[in-house]
From Swiss-Prot:
Intracellular or extracellular location(s): Cytoplasm
Superkingdom per UniProt: Bacteria
Alphabetized InterPro entries for the sequence: Ribosome_maturation_RimP, RimP_C, RimP_N, RimP_N_sf
A GO biological process held by the record: translation
Keyword Transport set for record: no
Record's GO cellular component terms: cytosol
Function: Required for maturation of 30S ribosomal subunits.
This protein's UniProt keywords: Cytoplasm, Ribosome biogenesis
Organism: Cutibacterium acnes (strain DSM 16379 / KPA171202)
Protein's name according to its UniProt entry: Ribosome maturation factor RimP
Amino acid sequence: MNAERLTRLLEPVVSQVGLELDRVDVVPAGRRRLVRVTIDGDGPDGHGPSLDEISEATAEISHCLDDSGAMGESPYTLEVSSRGVSTPLTQPRHYRRNIGHLVRFTLNPAEEQKSGETFDGRIAEAGEEVVTLEVEAENSKPHKPVYTTREVQLADVAKAVVQVELNRRDAQASKEEN
């Protein structure tokens, strides 16, 4: 069975456990097939599904595939995961779930340019068409940064990827206050 048909089969199953089906891939792996299912959801903290939710979804997906016979008689391996931090943000809900996170944006190039502007910004607000960012101002100094807001149309975004932060700025600010 191809990924498109599996997507139609699995969407209601994933929805029943309160999550969203993000992607389904079927990849040959020797004599077996690898069925990769990527799920998403708000989770208990609003930032993605918990391990318990992923575990519950995995069990339901496995039962559905076995009961429906969708994979036929040939063996397969099921792999269910959340989107992961390096997966580009593509939907308005992805931006909403990453409010407060630092994201590297690459904008679509203007007509006369070969590549678009690339910059980092912390998501402050996210709507269906626009994301509001907190970005470092041009007159900012390395040891005492100054921030300003910037609105970006989602239609203008070529790529947006969450950046891993080992020392978040808001965590440092709260330490300095104490």
